[in-house]
């Protein structure tokens, strides 16, 4: 595999952004891992999954279409003497994946009123997919309310939107594979400019809000 070798760098007159290769999806994976490490004595068991092959369909033994994560969770439940089916049903998952930030240079690919913007906080998506909701996970209104209440209570900046213009934009995440196991899941992540290019750009505020949201999610419970 050949990837750009340059280091990440500050971008902008105010140095408010970070430019680098591979923000998709390291910019979500890293704060998720750091949030898991920072979590102490959570009310419920927390699991942080850094899974592979998302860009090619989550196939293979290390992708989310595999059972490796769910077998691990089943083993946790059985060790604790609990029913794994009930545990899955009572779980909640954040599918941490980036989204395309509104780019005025390519405005035709976006719906400005329903897009997400760099610098306005972590982005939340009720549903993903393309061509409407094809190949999508569609989070319930109750789950959207739970997550937004949680962030509002701790002043975490967030925004909600869609993955680009209808029938033009769109994208897939691992959320549907988690939902297929009966676990309520919603997509959340950092908006990215120039996604899938050798030099992707994100806003530092959004990255910090992602970390805060993940820590809060691990510690909060209703």
Describe the residue ranges of each PLM region.
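His/Asp/Glu-rich mid-to-C-terminal helical/loop segments that flank catalytic regions of hydrolases
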Residues: 36-50, 190-222
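A glycine-rich helix N-cap at a beta->alpha junction
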Residues: 66-94
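Soluble metallo-hydrolase cores and metallopeptidase-like ectodomains found primarily
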Residues: 1-20
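Short acidic, glycine/serine/threonine-rich loops at helix termini
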Residues: 13-14, 58-63, 104-107, 199-200
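Acidic, glycine-rich active-site loops and adjacent beta-strand->loop/helix elements
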Residues: 6-8, 50-57, 98-100, 164-167, ...
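Flexible, glycine/charged-enriched surface loops at secondary-structure junctions
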Residues: 42-48, 81-90, 151-165, 222
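Alpha-helical metal-binding/catalytic segments enriched in His/Glu/Asp
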Residues: 19-65, 71, 213-215
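Active-site-adjacent substrate-binding region
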Residues: 101-106, 110-197
């Amino acid at each position: 595999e050949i990837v750009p070798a340059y280091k990440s760098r500050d971008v902008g007159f105010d140095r408010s952004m970070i430019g680098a290769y591979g923000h998709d999806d390291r910019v979500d994976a890293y704060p998720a891992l750091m949030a898991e490490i920072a979590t102490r004595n959570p009310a419920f068991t927390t699991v942080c999954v850094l899974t592979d092959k998302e860009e090619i369909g989550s196939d293979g033994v290390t992708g989310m279409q595999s059972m490796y994560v769910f077998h691990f969770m089943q083993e946790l439940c059985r060790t604790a003497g609990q029913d794994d089916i009930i545990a899955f049903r009572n779980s909640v998952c954040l599918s941490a994946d980036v989204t395309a930030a509104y780019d005025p240079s390519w405005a035709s690919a976006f719906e400005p009123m329903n897009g997400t913007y760099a610098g306005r906080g972590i982005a939340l998506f009720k549903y993903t997919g393309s061509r409407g909701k094809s190949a999508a996970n569609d989070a319930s209104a109750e789950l959207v309310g739970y997550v937004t209440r949680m962030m509002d209570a701790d002043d975490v900046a967030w925004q909600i939107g869609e993955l680009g213009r209808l029938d033009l934009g769109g994208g897939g995440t691992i959320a549907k594979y988690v939902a297929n196991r009966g676990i309520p899941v919603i997509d959340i992540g950092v908006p990215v400019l120039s996604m899938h290019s050798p030099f992707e750009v994100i806003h530092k505020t959004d990255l910090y809000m992602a970390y805060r949201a993940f820590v809060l999610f691990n510690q909060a419970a209703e």
